[in-house]
A protein has these predicted regions:
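Membrane-proximal intracellular helices of multi-pass ion channels
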Residues: 1-538
């Protein structure tokens, strides 16, 4: 292992995290959180919460720059291990502010929260978001934006181009999906293009949210007793960060329930756009629009969206006829039912995890559609999690090929994906990924099934009615693992859209934190990092 080079790159990441932490530090100063009388040091804790880790990151990061590696290249296993190390280090330091300012005093819970942010999961252990400081709300949502495109993708802009493929190893390890490649000849140029598109879309979305009506302040005031008529820029930024990274952390109670219909439609469309492979936007920019319309994955992606929205909309309108489940959520108009159907499909399929309503009380058919969307995810090369649309398409075609071979051993596969013949290796890689995905999923479920929280009752207060009792059981654990593995956020029942993950004990919290990392980095980098063979001298 090239320890010195790993340390040097890790040091660059730590310096970068320290620089990024200056943003929530600025928010703390802007909102004068140092004037707040909180705990023994008063509001100074909100300043120290970010100042202390910034100093630590700079000291360690710059110290690591003095190492002189003999080899300036990375092998594939080193690149994959480095990516996992980077995300773990970012989390360990990123959790410190929550502990210092006492917003999340338990360090394990704080690591869960910030890992949920960096991996764009959006699962939270916070029960009452109104008690959080502005700087905490900003940092955890800003982490969505940081992790959405990928931490190392950003660093690739500054790492010198190498001829040995080191940069490609890092990009492959961090970018979601079965196929990763350059969109232009040089990796640094590819990284710049990706981030410029990402930044541009974020700025456009934030501007639209700032200009249009954002929060229904009367409804929010009546339900929460808090006046949200001010701070529109802050709430628009928080929402834009969550959409861009397809995260899910919000800035007011009950996610986006109290947002205006305009804002909910805007977020729905934005999420679907951020769930598209960013290569498609590059093709549009260079005038190759026909190639976008020929994409098999994008056709499948929008077909799934239309089918899912249609099924949920019909289920909501005809719930009493097709489902004996007692629906406690009623929508006054057809438009409202359609809006919530579109919003939740967009949010769950792109693994954002925002909620506009309590979908946990929807008919069984609607909930099953959302569970399927949870596992599938959006397109490869997007900021979304899940298995990915491309893998689903390849798996279906691979299964068809295997069935044809069983019927006719002389059958020669001619299946294509995106205009290219599907190689047997690609199909096998997809099947291997799905097998590992299922294995981790089942193992995580078994572990958290020992948690004492199972069998307890949780009280849910939502727009479907206050004081609804939910038992923490199998479906709660299933959806908790699914939401963490697919980087979605809320699940169903005791971890539903109006609940949190705070009921789990420390060990289950650690398991779910690792599950989020495994899901975001798509298994292999984490497995390679913890494999003893990786660290043996050859």
């Amino acid at each position: 292992m090239n320890y010195k080079l790993l340390g040097k790159i890790l040091g660059k990441i730590m310096i970068l995290e320290g620089i990024l932490m200056m943003a929530p530090l600025a928010i703390s100063i802007i909102y004068k959180e140092y004037n707040k009388n909180v705990y023994s040091l008063g509001g100074v804790k909100n300043i120290l919460a970010f100042a202390i880790p910034i100093v630590l990151l700079f000291i360690i990061g710059f110290a690591l720059q003095f190492t002189k590696p003999q080899r300036k290249s990375l092998y594939q296993k080193e690149g994959f291990a480095l990516v996992a190390m980077v995300w773990i280090v970012m989390t360990l330091f990123g959790a410190i502010p929550f502990v210092i300012n006492r917003d999340i005093p338990n360090y394990i819970d704080a690591c869960f929260e910030i890992m949920s942010g960096f991996t764009t999961t959006g699962a939270s252990i916070i029960d009452d978001i109104t008690l959080m400081s502005h700087s905490t709300l900003f940092w955890r949502s800003f982490s969505h934006w940081i992790g959405g495109m990928g931490i190392l993708v950003f660093v690739l802009i500054f790492i010198p181009e190498s001829k040995d493929g080191s940069a490609m190893h890092l990009l492959r390890a961090e970018s979601p999906g079965p196929q990763v490649g350059k969109i232009v000849s040089k990796m640094r140029a590819t990284a710049r293009i990706l981030y410029l598109i990402y930044l541009g879309m974020t700025v456009i979305l934030a501007s639209i949210l700032m200009i249009g009506p954002l929060i229904d302040t009367n409804a929010a005031l009546q339900a929460t007793g808090i006046d949200y008529s001010g701070d529109k820029v802050f709430h628009a930024l928080i929402t834009a960060f969550g959409c861009a990274g397809t995260g899910g952390f919000g800035s007011i109670p009950n996610s986006l329930q109290y947002f205006t219909p305009f804002a909910q439609y805007t977020v729905s469309i934005a999420l679907l756009l951020f769930g598209i492979n960013f290569t498609m936007y590059y093709l549009i920019l260079i005038g190759k629009i026909k190639d976008v319309f020929r994409s098999e994955e994008i056709k499948t992606y929008f077909s799934i969206i239309i089918a899912a929205v249609g099924l949920i909309f019909i289920s909501l309108k005809l719930g009493g006829i097709i489902d004996s489940f007692a629906i406690t959520q009623n929508y006054d108009t057809t438009e409202e039912a359609f809006r919530h159907s579109l919003f939740q499909v967009a949010s769950i399929l792109t693994t954002a995890g925002f909620s506009s309503t309590d979908y946990d009380v929807w008919p069984v058919l609607s909930k099953m559609v959302l569970v399927i969307c949870m596992l599938m995810g959006a397109m490869a090369g997007s900021t979304a999690g899940g298995i990915k649309t491309s893998r689903i398409v390849i798996a279906v075609k691979g299964s068809y090929i295997n069935i044809r071979k069983l019927i006719n051993p002389r059958y020669v596969p001619k299946a294509k994906f995106e205009g290219k013949l599907l190689e047997e290796k690609t199909i096998n890689d997809v099947f291997a990924f799905i097998t590992m995905y299922a294995g981790v999923f089942v193992l995580a479920m078994l572990i958290i099934s020992f948690d004492p929280v199972n069998g307890t009752t949780v009280i849910i207060n939502s727009d479907a009615g206050a004081g609804r009792e939910v038992t923490h059981g199998f479906f709660s654990n299933f959806s908790a693992v699914a939401s963490c593995m697919s980087n979605i956020g809320p699940g169903f029942e005791a971890v539903g859209p109006y609940a949190s993950f705070s009921g789990y004990n420390w060990f289950s919290t650690i398991i779910l934190t690792l599950t989020m990392l495994i899901g975001r980095l798509e298994i292999l980098p984490v497995f390679i990092l913890f494999s003893p063979r990786t660290w043996k001298k050859i």
